[in-house]
Amino acid sequence: MNRRRRIYEGKAKILYEGPEPGTLVQFFKDDATAFNAKKHEVIDGKGVLNNRISEHIFTQLNRIGIPTHFIRRLNMREQLIKEVEIIPLEVVVRNVAAGSLAKRLGLEEGTVLPRSIIEFYYKADALDDPMVTEEHITAFGWASPPEIDDIMALAIRVNDFLTGLFLGIGIQLVDFKMECGRLWEGDMMRIVVADEISPDSARLWDITTNDKLDKDRFRRDMGGLVEAYQEVARRLGIMNENDTPRPAGPTLVK
């Protein structure tokens, strides 16, 4: 790892130079952060689980024709991805009132929304990722109107897919965050889904008990984060049924 050139390090992942031009290696760390890293802890096994869950989801997205940056998983913590120009926006799709939306609008957490809502947040930790409008996005040149249309179309398709995927394993998709990037192929450019989709970036509730199976367990000091992520992986079929939580981290199907 030390021989590779580090391109970027974020709160939960590191990007290294890839083996071929136009590729990067995405490494998943065990760091758990909340409130723009004001709360931080290292949790053994979290990176392994996020890598496997995100791999599973991105593989399925690619399979149904939703373009992503994902190429393949390299090992338990790393993925090979296409190099993209990240658009500095977090795209949040909400199906159920929770988190900041419930607080901002005075909604009872768990209220099913009349329809799915798409929100944009400007990626700037120093500013606490402020919510922005399409007017802000176009005025400051973060994305063009056609690109916004593409991003919203992708967000709707991903939401439809994830809602069905998780419903089939007894989980309600409350909301999720995704990022997009510009993938250049010669003179052609298209918008693709980038970053990761995992319990770090989605609120996932057990459909029967409303038990939280996501990073809210860390945000709210509930404990059991790795066990919750393992449960998601088990239901998705990427963990052995007989695997049990261990301090050294999870055991996953290769």
Swiss-Prot record:
Pathway: Purine metabolism; IMP biosynthesis via de novo pathway; 5-amino-1-(5-phospho-D-ribosyl)imidazole-4-carboxamide from 5-amino-1-(5-phospho-D-ribosyl)imidazole-4-carboxylate: step 1/2. PROSITE patterns: SAICAR_SYNTHETASE_1 (PS01057). It comes from Brucella anthropi (strain ATCC 49188 / DSM 6882 / CCUG 24695 / JCM 21032 / LMG 3331 / NBRC 15819 / NCTC 12168 / Alc 37) (Ochrobactrum anthropi). It holds the Pfam family SAICAR_synt. Keywords: ATP-binding, Ligase, Nucleotide-binding, Purine biosynthesis. One of its GO terms (biological process) is cobalamin biosynthetic process. Its EC number is 6.3.2.6. InterPro entries: SAICAR_synt/ADE2_N (IPR028923), SAICAR_synt_PurC (IPR033934), SAICAR_synth (IPR001636), SAICAR_synthetase (IPR050089), SAICAR_synthetase_CS (IPR018236). One of its GO terms (cellular component) is cytosol. HAMAP family: SAICAR_synth. Belongs to the SAICAR synthetase family. It catalyses: 5-amino-1-(5-phospho-D-ribosyl)imidazole-4-carboxylate + L-aspartate + ATP = (2S)-2-[5-amino-1-(5-phospho-beta-D-ribosyl)imidazole-4-carboxamido]succinate + ADP + phosphate + 2 H(+). CDD domains: SAICAR_synt_PurC (cd01415). One of its GO terms (molecular function) is ATP binding. This is Phosphoribosylaminoimidazole-succinocarboxamide synthase. It comes from the Bacteria.
